[in-house]
């Protein structure tokens, strides 16, 4: 059965100035109704080049407790490396449809990798206005080049270079999260799988939408340990804070860091997995490049023992990551 891609629907919808019913959110979810207007939140910005490591640790820890999201600048990844990553991803989504379908997710596949549209069980049959491409970029043993675009030819080099540079940033983030709770520096990285941690790249492609007031990405928390995201220049992130949805402002050349479910679990609830969603734009294509830092499927994740005691009993079960992911994607209780 042929799957209709959002990119194709967008080009048809442009002509008739409407969108199919399955992309229209329920009234209480629609961005025009559910968003606090006139207020743009300044997501915390943390300078990773600061010579005072204690200060960085304090800022990362505070942002992870209060927000579950922050931006990092002077992170050590050259702007040119990020620009190339964006360039080759944009090029892929501009290819003819039949060429993109060559690396489509096989029907019935249990793997998340490949080009696709529908990701998980949609709430009330509603769909997100987005196409995507998933593939693993690290470690080498986890990579399946079958799902990496052959076109543009520079795609592989750009992604491998970004993966190489990202590792140091990720290691430091895990260290700061650990030190922020008075743990050993490797506590969070080891708890999430250590050197077997999987780096899963996703490219989100949100085409222009004739009715951005009606469509939304699905509100969710990330099931990863942490997510490190590169946005394009079109804003569209909303964060749920203090009972309301707010638009968030990015700053140029920053990486956006989301605390995911596995860090919330390991921290026994001290750090918060950020509840977020995306809006779409009438005129412009929005793209983003999140990398999900995921435990290996059989790795067990649970609260770090040092954070559990009589006053603070375990708030989460310890379970294999693949079992957690299955429950999350199928909307089953954990």
Curated annotation (Swiss-Prot):
EC supergroup of this enzyme: oxidoreductase
Enzyme Commission number: 1.14.11.9, 1.14.20.6
GO cellular-component term (any): cytoplasm
Binding site for Fe cation: 220, 222, 276
Cofactor-binding details, from the entry: Binds 1 Fe cation per subunit.
Gene3D superfamilies: B-lactam Antibiotic, Isopenicillin N Synthase, Chain (2.60.120.330)
Keyword Transmembrane helix: no
Keywords in alphabetical order: Cytoplasm, Dioxygenase, Flavonoid biosynthesis, Iron, Metal-binding, Oxidoreductase, Vitamin C
Primary residence: cytoplasm
A UniProt-annotated Pfam family: DIOX_N
Catalytic activity: a (2R,3R)-dihydroflavonol + 2-oxoglutarate + O2 = a flavonol + succinate + CO2 + H2O; a (2S)-flavan-4-one + 2-oxoglutarate + O2 = a (2R,3R)-dihydroflavonol + succinate + CO2
Transit peptide found in the keyword field: no
Occurrences of domain Fe2OG dioxygenase (ranges): 196-295
Highest rank taxon of the organism: Eukaryota
Cellular localization per UniProt: Cytoplasm
Cofactor needs: Fe cation; L-ascorbate
GO MF annotations, alphabetized: flavanone 3-dioxygenase activity; flavonol synthase activity; L-ascorbic acid binding; metal ion binding
Pathway where it operates: Secondary metabolite biosynthesis; flavonoid biosynthesis
Biological process terms in GO annotation: coumarin biosynthetic process; response to molecule of fungal origin
PANTHER family found in the cross-reference section: OXOGLUTARATE/IRON-DEPENDENT DIOXYGENASE
Recorded family membership: Belongs to the iron/ascorbate-dependent oxidoreductase family.
Function per UniProt: Catalyzes the formation of flavonols from dihydroflavonols. It can act on dihydrokaempferol to produce kaempferol, on dihydroquercetin to produce quercitin and on dihydromyricetin to produce myricetin.
Protein name as catalogued: Flavonol synthase/flavanone 3-hydroxylase
Naturally occurring in which organism (per UniProt): Eustoma exaltatum subsp. russellianum
